[in-house]
Each structure stands twice: as C-alpha cells, then as structure tokens.
Regions:
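A charged N-terminal "starter" segment
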Residues: 1-113, 118-132
C-alpha cells in the first residue's frame, strides 16, 4: 500500500483553496483497505458504518466495491436507498431505534437488526415482524 501523507505546504495550499474545515479523503486507500479485508478474511462481510463518514464519494466507492452498510437512522436508510442500495445490503444497528427508522427499514426491506435490550426486540417485532435479530 502506498503511503498517503500531505506536507505542511500541501495542506496549507488546500486550506487556502477550499477553506476550513477541510477533509481530505483517499478513495484509493479506501479501496485498498476494503480489498485487503475481503482478501485476507474471505468469509467476512463488510458493513460500513455510515455514521463514521457519510461523504458521498466514500459511499459511492463502497457501493461500487459491493460493501454492505450499517445504518442507524431513517435518514441514513433513505440516503442509501436513494443511491440504489437495497435493504438486503443494510443492517440496522442502533441501540435505541426510532419508530420512524423501523418503518423506513421495513419499507426498504432491511431484515437484519441488532439489539441491546428486550424492549428493542419487542419494538423490532412490532414494526418489522419478519426481522432477523442478531
């Protein structure tokens, strides 16, 4: 893997051009890291947590690579759905799921859910009766 480093001068030039705050993303490194995980742990299914960084370019790259996604809100579900990601490629993993989120999950066909309490299981069952709870 190639190193990705910015010199102080390069960073200063970027700030002058784009202002702050500034986020510099290496899509090449995202792809390399994704492929390394898949190569060395072949049974692994990658679920990228949108909350980590929802930059459109990152999501587009991961969609192209075939990634799955960890969603935590109705907004994240809608975002991925608009980008063409099916519910089969998502897991709803929020310790306290909203009713809006569960309804949206049911609409797009999300079947996999995590839970942290018995109350969450009851809520999931009510709004997504055919859910798979992990």
């Amino acid at each position: 893997m190639k190193s990705f480093k910015l010199t102080k001068e390069e960073a200063t030039m970027l700030v002058q051009k784009y202002a702050t705050p500034l986020e510099v993303i290496s899509l090449e490194h995202i792809e390399e890291n994704y492929n390394l995980l898949c190569k060395h742990i072949p049974r692994l299914k990658v679920f990228y947590a949108i909350k980590a960084n929802s930059a459109k370019c990152i999501l587009e790259k991961l969609i192209k690579l075939g990634s799955n996604f960890d969603v935590a809100s109705a907004g994240e579900i809608r975002l991925l759905s608009k980008m063409g990601v099916s519910g089969e490629k998502m897991i709803y993993a929020n310790p306290v799921k909203t009713i809006e989120g569960l309804i949206e999950a049911s609409k797009v066909g999300i079947k996999r859910f995590t839970f942290d309490s018995e109350n969450e299981i009851d809520k999931i069952k009510k709004y997504v009766p055919d859910a798979e709870v992990l």
